[in-house]
């Protein structure tokens, strides 16, 4: 398998304003009983509309409350509840942790899954990966569905009602994919399907980057007013679909690897995944020895749209050398993706790269 070029994707991707109205009809393709998982915030904001849609379609839906953290205990609890109800399809409505918990239930019960993201802050919706946390909110393991979600249904009207910070975080997550995939190509790194990259994966990563550079500012301005326009549609597709396909079939490198070191620090508890990745990309570009002008131009773009350029923006208000040391050490020890960097990276060199970003 590791010599074969491999590409994976959801069976179907649907996006547009009021797309969630079609949820009962789509779920009914897999059976008559849906297990709909939502947290309290999403249930309060969008639950009534989803319930109304199911009632209008005269479909059975069992609604279950997500506790807020994707742990083995939460997956087990939800799977038991779904099994008791003899459900046919799992529907995950919400953010990344809700979606990953729904994927976990789908895996436990071997039933189809429909993913309905309420925010476009990361590329979890299209992925078959399930990121599981421990009770201390640290990543404990990553599991995989046998295939990507059956359907990803993205309602851009719902996305636009969320705070613009979530869309911006999705941009931060997505913008790194082009550069990480390029490093994986150089090192012949395997993607998340255990195969080599396809030209399609690299093309999607490039397209993702181009869309982000062209449409981000206008999309963020629209979402600040809870409006949907073509710029928003482009950015949502980049954040969710292109970024998701790009990372799984293209691979990851240092930008994502640094999240291991960052999330080990209590200062980043309130930072979003994409914010961490965006900063991590700057470190990766320094490690790649990219021209200073290139990095400086990207920093300017970050500043223009609001992405973090320094650790102070991620919660490190009084940064000290020992914190940089720990970020670098944990990343080097625990992040598997750093080996995908074309230039070998020691802990000492990683510390130097972080400090150079902080001097930008």
Ranges and model annotations:
Residues 192-307:
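Active-site segments that bind and position negatively charged phosphate/pyrophosphate groups
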Residues 22, 290-360:
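C-terminal charged capping/lid subdomain of soluble metabolic enzymes
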Residues 12, 34-35, 61, 88-91, ...:
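Structural motif
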Residues 107-200:
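A glycine/threonine-rich phosphate-anchoring loop and its flanking beta-alpha core
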Residues 82-105, 109-119:
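A short, small-residue-rich loop immediately preceding and capping a beta-strand
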Residues 1-89, 311:
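ATP/NTP phosphate-donor binding region
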């Amino acid at each position: 398998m590791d010599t074969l070029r491999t590409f994976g994707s959801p069976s179907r991707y649907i996006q547009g304003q009021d797309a969630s109205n079609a949820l009962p009809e789509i779920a009914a393709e897999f059976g008559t009983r849906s297990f709909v998982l939502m947290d309290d915030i999403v249930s309060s904001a969008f639950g009534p509309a989803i319930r109304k849609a199911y009632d209008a379609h005269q479909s059975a839906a069992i609604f279950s409350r997500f506790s807020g953290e994707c742990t083995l205990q939460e997956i087990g609890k939800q799977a038991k509840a779904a099994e008791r109800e003899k459900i046919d399809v799992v529907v995950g409505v919400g953010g990344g942790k809700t979606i990953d918990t729904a994927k976990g239930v789908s895996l436990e019960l071997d039933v189809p899954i429909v993913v309905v993201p309420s925010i476009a802050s990361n590329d979890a919706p299209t992925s078959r990966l399930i990121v599981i946390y421990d009770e201390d909110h640290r990543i404990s393991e990553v599991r995989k569905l046998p295939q990507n979600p059956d359907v990803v249904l993205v309602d851009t009207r719902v996305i636009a009602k969320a705070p613009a910070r979530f869309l911006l975080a999705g941009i931060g997550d997505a913008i790194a994919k082009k550069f990480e995939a390029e490093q994986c190509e150089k090192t012949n790194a395997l993607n998340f399907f255990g195969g080599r990259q396809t030209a399609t994966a690299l093309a999607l990563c490039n397209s993702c980057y181009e869309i982000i550079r062209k449409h981000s500012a206008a999309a963020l301005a629209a979402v600040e007013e809870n409006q949907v326009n073509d710029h928003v549609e482009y950015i949502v597709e980049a954040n969710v679909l292109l970024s998701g396909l790009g990372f799984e079939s293209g691979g990851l490198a240092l930008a994502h690897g640094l999240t291991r070191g960052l999330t080990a620090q209590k200062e980043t508890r309130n930072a979003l995944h994409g914010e961490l990745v965006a900063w991590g990309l700057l470190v990766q570009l320094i490690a790649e020895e990219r021209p200073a002008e290139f990095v400086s131009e990207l920093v300017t773009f970050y500043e223009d749209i609001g992405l973090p350029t320094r650790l102070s923006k991620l919660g490190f208000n009084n940064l000290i050398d020992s914190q940089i040391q720990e970020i670098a050490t944990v990343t080097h020890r625990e992040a598997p993706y750093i080996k995908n960097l074309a230039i070998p990276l020691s802990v000492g060199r990683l510390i130097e790269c972080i400090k150079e970003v902080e001097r930008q």
